[in-house]
């Protein structure tokens, strides 16, 4: 029986089905945005033929893949010669570093899924190679056009030129973000590991390690940044450690994770809102996975308990502070909150009906029924290998539609809207209803959410669909490690009514620069080669603290390094 009823179906979803639906939503949204939306600078078919094998691009002949993504747009879909493109008159042509790094990271993570279709489905399998090559084009573009004269990755904008020869990429007045440098570090490093067959992969790895060493050498100065910024940097370092097992990266993760945890406690939540606290929790999860140190596990589970206590089961809402007439939630804090609860079962083997109930209600109230998601992609067709365990196409292996979407959810074809998250959600305590924000696509928010969902859930889903036996438990070390070296005693978590927000510290300005026109509108026919400067491989350790005036701030030190190595 396929349709049981929306109310019963929503309340009967398992945590595995919810995680799978969030993954599928993210996977299909990224596919659509990158291949069809044209919400950014795209490469044309001629360029694809020059950089891709013929059989790799035959399935994408009508698409215009993005090599960079813009910040904002209306996600209304209309049919044209470019298939399901968006209305380009609504594009805000800022080019954020974070959105673009996260877009590339999402594509690279999806490669592991599509590679499973080798010798099963050539179209799906070739998507992996296509995404690798496209990711490389994107990274080449970032290296060439998204850096300022000092070498920092900075936000740019695509200024329309009166000349028909192309568009101008110019620098915005935004301040340089250290977390943006960390995101790019992760993107370049992940490419080197996902595409080891590429002769340039070692160059990309060396480039990423240069940025890592910059953070390692000047880690003390990182501690002057905001808690939110430190959490974002720590998240990138944790994910890089998962791929690299780099000892310097591990030591930095230990120091920075310990620092943000103590800073959170010492501040008595003065710095924290739900978004930052949820990102902190995710870092504690990753830090424990990477180091097996129990202090991080305990902190994570304490935060999970706090999240559970924040949920009002009677009203079905997340409480933020004392009673209010209206609660406002950002899309990122809702998704991080839900991700943490879903992942908590990895570290807490005891079944928790309370947590599963919260997950079900948060997903139903905040994601499905609130309107914060504009549409849900259709499940794969019954003749698709994606619908079957082990890709068998056998009726007994058919995967239920509930692993992909709610049966009563609106599809993009019905709404005319691409599947994205609107920015905010409000809950009226008087009317007991949710209202979503205006329908606008913000890539800085959406690409973050999509990457978090893909990165958090794709490995388990691959194990599920390939019917891989569960790995034995107790992979973690079991020795009791209650504290780290030089770690202060941890205080109890702050009470719920102490929650409030604080504006993050903004890093210093990185300067401006004018750039020449680079392309015809929405097309790039030529892209500069990948970073192959021999200075890239030079050891950065020579720029030690002893060689730099202690009074220099972090920004100046980083500029010296980047300028010297021509990053």
Q: What residue spans do the PLM features occupy?
A:
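Glycan-recognition and catalytic cores of secretory/periplasmic carbohydrate-active enzymes
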Residues: 1-567
């Amino acid at each position: 029986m396929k349709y049981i009823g929306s109310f019963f179906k929503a309340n009967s979803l398992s945590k595995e089905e919810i995680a799978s639906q969030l993954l599928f939503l993210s996977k299909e949204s990224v596919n659509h945005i990158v291949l069809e939306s044209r919400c950014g600078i795209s490469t044309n078919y001629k360029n694809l033929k020059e950089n891709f094998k013929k059989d790799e691009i035959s399935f994408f002949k009508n698409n215009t893949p993005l090599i960079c993504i813009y910040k904002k747009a209306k996600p209304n879909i209309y049919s044209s010669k470019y298939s399901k493109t968006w209305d380009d008159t609504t594009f805000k042509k800022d080019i954020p570093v974070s959105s673009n790094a996260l877009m590339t990271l999402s594509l690279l993570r999806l490669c592991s899924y599509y590679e499973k279709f080798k010798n099963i489905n050539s179209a799906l399998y070739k998507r992996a190679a296509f995404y690798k090559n496209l990711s490389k084009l994107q990274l080449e573009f970032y290296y060439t056009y998204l850096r300022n004269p000092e070498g920092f990755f900075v936000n740019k904008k695509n200024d329309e030129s009166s000349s028909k020869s192309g568009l101008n990429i110019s620098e915005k007045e935004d301040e340089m973000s250290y977390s943006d440098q960390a995101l790019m570090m992760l993107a370049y490093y992940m490419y080197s590991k996902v595409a080891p067959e590429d002769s340039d992969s070692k160059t990309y790895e060396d480039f990423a390690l240069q940025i890592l060493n910059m953070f390692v050498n000047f880690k003390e100065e990182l501690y002057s940044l905001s808690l939110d910024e430190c959490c974002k940097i720590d998240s990138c370092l944790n994910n890089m450690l998962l791929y690299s097992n780099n000892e310097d990266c591990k030591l930095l993760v230990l120091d920075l994770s310990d620092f943000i945890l103590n800073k959170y406690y010492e501040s008595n939540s003065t710095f924290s809102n739900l978004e930052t606290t949820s990102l902190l929790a995710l870092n504690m999860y990753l830090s424990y996975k990477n180091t097996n140190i129990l202090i991080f596990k305990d902190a994570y589970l304490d935060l999970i308990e706090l999240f559970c206590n924040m949920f009002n089961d009677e009203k079905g809402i997340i409480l933020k502070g004392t009673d209010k007439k209206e609660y406002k939630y950002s899309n990122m804090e809702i998704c991080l909150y839900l991700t943490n609860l879903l992942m908590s079962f990895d570290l807490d083997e005891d079944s928790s009906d309370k947590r599963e109930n919260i997950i079900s209600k948060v997903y139903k109230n905040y994601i499905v029924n609130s309107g914060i998601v504009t549409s849900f992609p259709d499940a794969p067709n019954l003749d698709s290998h994606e619908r079957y365990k082990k890709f068998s196409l056998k009726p007994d292996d058919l995967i239920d539609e509930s692993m992909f979407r709610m049966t009563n959810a609106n599809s993009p074809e019905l709404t005319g809207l691409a599947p994205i998250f609107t920015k905010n959600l409000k809950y009226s305590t008087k009317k007991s209803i949710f209202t979503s924000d205006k329908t606008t696509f913000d890539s800085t928010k959406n690409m973050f959410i999509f990457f978090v969902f893909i990165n958090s859930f794709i490995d388990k889903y691959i194990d599920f669909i390939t019917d891989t036996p569960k790995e034995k438990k107790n992979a973690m070390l079991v020795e009791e490690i209650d504290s780290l070296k030089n770690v202060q005693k941890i205080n109890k978590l702050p009470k719920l009514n102490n929650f409030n927000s604080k504006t993050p510290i903004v890093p210093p300005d990185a300067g401006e620069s004018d750039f020449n026109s680079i392309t015809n509108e929405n097309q790039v026919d030529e892209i500069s080669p990948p970073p192959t400067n021999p200075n890239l491989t030079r050891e950065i350790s020579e720029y030690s603290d002893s060689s730099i005036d202690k009074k220099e701030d972090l920004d100046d030190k980083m500029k010296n390094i980047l300028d010297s190595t021509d990053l």
